[in-house]
A protein has these predicted regions:
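Conserved small/polar residues in nucleotide/adenosyl-binding loops
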Residues: 189-193
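Mg2+-dependent prenyl diphosphate-binding active-site environment of isoprenoid biosynthetic enzymes
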Residues: 1-185
């Protein structure tokens, strides 16, 4: 179980390092990002190094199903990040597309962690699917809360610049719900982008 947990943590950290480069984030959790301390190229290589280490740890589980799920999760997360980047400042996004996007990013990692834990621990098959769904729902909830905090908390509370999602053109659930309640204001939001 420990190699799986280490692989998930390394994968998560690698994605955060890459996210900070993409977002040009100066800090995370109140501390300078790797890109701020070094440079973008070194940060990308550090993230890649962590991806490779994560793959090494997941391989130590010796479970081909867990290894395949891990590889699929990496692909799904990369696709989610690409989708988010390609839809920046696209204010026509709807709530379902938002849910699809966060399912492909945060929720897929939580789902793989929960499912992989069940598999590696030898849980009966009837529990594996429910554990995956639990992880996915937990990941969705985590991302929604994170998006709400980006919209409502201060930079000091977040440890990073508040409102960074909106500034980078990432349309999150709070923005979608606001635009849904105030359709007349949608033209104003479109002009922001």
């Amino acid at each position: 179980l420990v190699p799986l947990a280490a692989s998930v943590e390394l994968l998560h950290t690698a994605t955060l390092i890459h996210d900070d480069v993409i977002d040009a984030a100066p800090e995370r959790r109140g501390r300078p990002t790797a890109a701020a301390l070094f440079n973008n190229a070194s940060s990308v290589m550090l993230g890649d190094y962590m991806f490779a280490h994560a793959a090494e740890f997941v391989a130590r589980t010796g479970n081909i199903r867990v290894i395949r799920n891990f590889a699929d999760t990496l692909r799904v997360m990369a696709n989610g990040e690409l989708t988010q980047d390609m839809s920046a400042f696209e204010y026509s996004e709807d709530v379902q597309r938002y849910f699809d996007r966060i399912a492909g990013k945060t929720a897929s990692l939580f789902a793989t962690a929960a499912e992989g834990g069940a598999i590696v621990c030898g849980a009966p098959e009837r529990y594996v699917g429910p554990m995956r769904r639990y992880g996915e729902q937990l990941g969705m909830a985590f991302q929604i809360v994170d998006d709400i905090l980006d919209f409502s908390a201060t930079s000091e509370e977040l440890g990073k610049p508040a409102g960074s999602d909106l500034l980078s053109g990432t349309v999150t659930l709070p923005a979608l719900l606001y635009m849904g309640r105030s359709p007349a204001d949608r033209s104003e939001e479109r002009r922001v982008g």
